[in-house]
């Protein structure tokens, strides 16, 4: 199951299975949240003074300021302090992801190996949900997720357990470490 954006990536992953890969299914529920929309909606909720204090004009060139602003915007989104007609509310994002995971478990059944290719926001949300952590922690986990990392879930008919989070065993070699990135 993949988000719509990653069909080519899924095809490359499937090649590694040498003929045993399950069919690729595009699942829009695993699409990442729209961070640009969240950022701009949050920015519109601030006064000009608050924007200046946050360093709005320099965000594109200052990574630290950008990260700080993005974290504030994401917290406001999770707390339902910002909304826009075209923006999925946090509750909808969370429900879409957790509902889809539950549906996959039901429809696929036990003892299956499935691969879901998605992004940090989705992964952080799933991990926080499984661990009984707050929505804020789910967003915080998002910032920690490496590109190309592995998060492994083990599931049965009645529960899901986290087996690995943010693993990079496939990149843990000196000649590949430069490939370890965020966002």
Identify the residue ranges that each predicted region occupies.
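Beta-strand elements within well-structured catalytic alpha/beta cores of enzymes
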Residues: 1-2, 112-118
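A mid-sequence, solvent-exposed acidic-amphipathic segment
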Residues: 83-113
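Domain-level recognition of soluble alpha/beta enzyme cores
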Residues: 134-159
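Short aromatic-enriched loop/helix-cap "lid" or pocket-rim segments at secondary-structure transitions
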Residues: 35-41, 128-129, 165, 174-177
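Phosphate-coordination/substrate-recognition cap region in phosphate-metabolizing enzymes
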Residues: 1-67
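Acidic, His/Gly-rich catalytic cores of divalent-metal-dependent hydrolytic chemistry
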Residues: 160-183
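Short glycine/proline- and acidic residue-enriched helix-loop micro-motifs
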Residues: 52-92
